[in-house]
C-alpha cells in the first residue's frame, strides 16, 4: 500500500517491517562464522514480531545454502551491509561517549537495542524516538525477555512528522547539553522537505560539542528514477518469492533532495563522509558490485 501523509505502521507492516528486516539481517550477521557485530537481541525481537519469513531467517537451523544461489548471495550482501552500518553507528556513539557526551538520541529507533547492549558510561541518557506502537512493542518484548537497559533509557513515543522536539524535551532532554544523534535507515522514508525540517530541528536542539551521524540516500536524478524503481521492484520480487510481500517502491521517496553534508555545513556543522563500499572495506567485508546496488549510500558524521 502506498504511503500517505500521516500513515502509521507496526513492526510487521509498511516502513515498520523494514525495521524487522534489518533486525533479521543483524541476527544473521551476529550468527555468521566470523561475526562483525554482536546483537544478542536481534533474533529474539524478530521472533517476537512474528513475521514468518524473518522468523525462519533467524532460526538456529536456518540453512542459507537451501536458497537458490542468487537469493543466498543477496541475503549475505544485505547482512554484511547491515553489519557494517551497525558498526558505524555503534562506533559513533562510543566515540561520542569517550569525548564526554552523555546525551544520546536515536531517531526512528525501530528494533534498535543499543540502550541494552552498548557499554554506556555512568550518567548517560539514551532517548529512543519512534511511533507509539513501535515503542510499546519493543519495550514490552525486551521486558518479556528479561532484558535490562545498560543505561538510563527513555522511550519517546511520537511520530517524527509531528512535534517530536516538544515530546523529547518533556522526556528530560536538555538542549543546553552536547548531544549525539543518529538517523539510521531513516531519511529515504522521508519526503525531501521533511528531511530538511528534521536536520533543522536537530540543529536547533544541538548545543556546542554536539554531533550527528546520518545514513544518506543521495538524490536520484529524474532520468534514473525508472532504473532505480526497477531495481527496487526486483528486490521486492525476490523477497516475495520467499514469502515476504513488501513493495519497497511504495515506501521510499525518490524525489530530488538536499545533499546532507552540504546542508549541514551550511548550518554550521563540520562534516566527514564515507561511502557504503568504503564502510564495508573498513570493516573487512566484501564490497558490493555496482550492478547489485540500489543507489549509493553515504554515511555522514557532523560535529559543531
Curated annotation (Swiss-Prot):
Keywords from the UniProt entry: Methyltransferase, S-adenosyl-L-methionine, Transferase
The keyword Ribonucleoprotein is assigned to this record: no
Gene Ontology BP, a term: methylation
Binding site for S-adenosyl-L-methionine: 130, 159-160
UniProt cross-references to InterPro entries, sorted A to Z: Ppm1/Ppm2/Tcmp, SAM-dependent_MTases_sf, SAM_mthyl_Trfase_ML2640-like
EC number from the UniProt entry: 2.1.1.-
Pfam families the UniProt entry points to: LCM
A GO molecular-function annotation: methyltransferase activity
Top-level lineage group: Bacteria
Stated role: Exhibits S-adenosyl-L-methionine-dependent methyltransferase activity.
Family recorded in the similarity comment: Belongs to the UPF0677 family.
NCBIfam families given in the database record: mthyl_TIGR00027
UniProt protein name: Putative S-adenosyl-L-methionine-dependent methyltransferase MSMEG_1482/MSMEI_1446
Naturally occurring in which organism (per UniProt): Mycolicibacterium smegmatis (strain ATCC 700084 / mc(2)155) (Mycobacterium smegmatis)
Amino acid at each position: 500500500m502506498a504511503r500517505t501523509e500521516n500513515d502509521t505502521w507496526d513492526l510487521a507492516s509498511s516502513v515498520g517491517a523494514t525495521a524487522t528486516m534489518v533486525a533479521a539481517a543483524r541476527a544473521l550477521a551476529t550468527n555468521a562464522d566470523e561475526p562483525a557485530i554482536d546483537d544478542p537481541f536481534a533474533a529474539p525481537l524478530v521472533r517476537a514480531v512474528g513475521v514468518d519469513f524473518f522468523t525462519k531467517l533467524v532460526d538456529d537451523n536456518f540453512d542459507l545454502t537451501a536458497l537458490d544461489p542468487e537469493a543466498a548471495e543477496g541475503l549475505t550482501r544485505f547482512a554484511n551491509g547491515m553489519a557494517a552500518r551497525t558498526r558505524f553507528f555503534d562506533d559513533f556513539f562510543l566515540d561520542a561517549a569517550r569525548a564526554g557526551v552523555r546525551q544520546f538520541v536515536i531517531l526512528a529507533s525501530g528494533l534498535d537495542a543499543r540502550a541494552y547492549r552498548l557499554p554506556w558510561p555512568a550518567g548517560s541518557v539514551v532517548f529512543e524516538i519512534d511511533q507509539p506502537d513501535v515503542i510499546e512493542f519493543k519495550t514490552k518484548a525486551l521486558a518479556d525477555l528479561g532484558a535490562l537497559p545498560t543505561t538510563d533509557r527513555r522511550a519517546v513515543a511520537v511520530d517524527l512528522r509531528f512535534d517530536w522536539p516538544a515530546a523529547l524535551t518533556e522526556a528530560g532532554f536538555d538542549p543546553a547539553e552536547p548531544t549525539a544523534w543518529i538517523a539510521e535507515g531513516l531519511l529515504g522514508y522521508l519526503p525531501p522537505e521533511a528531511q530538511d525540517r528534521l536536520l533543522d530541528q536537530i540543529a536547533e536542539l544541538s548545543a556546542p560539542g554536539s554531533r550527528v551521524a546520518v545514513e544518506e540516500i543521495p538524490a536520484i536524478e529524474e532520468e534514473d528514477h525508472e532504473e532505480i524503481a526497477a531495481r527496487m521492484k526486483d528486490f521486492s520480487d525476490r523477497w516475495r518469492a520467499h514469502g515476504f510481500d513488501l513493495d519497497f517502491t511504495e515506501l521510499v521517496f525518490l524525489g530530488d533532495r538536499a545533499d546532507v553534508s552540504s546542508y549541514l555545513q551550511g548550518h554550521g556543522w563540520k562534516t566527514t563522509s564515507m561511502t557504503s563500499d568504503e564502510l564495508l572495506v573498513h570493516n573487512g567485508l566484501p564490497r558490493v558490485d555496482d550492478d547489485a546496488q540500489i543507489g549509493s549510500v553515504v554515511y555522514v558524521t557532523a560535529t559543531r
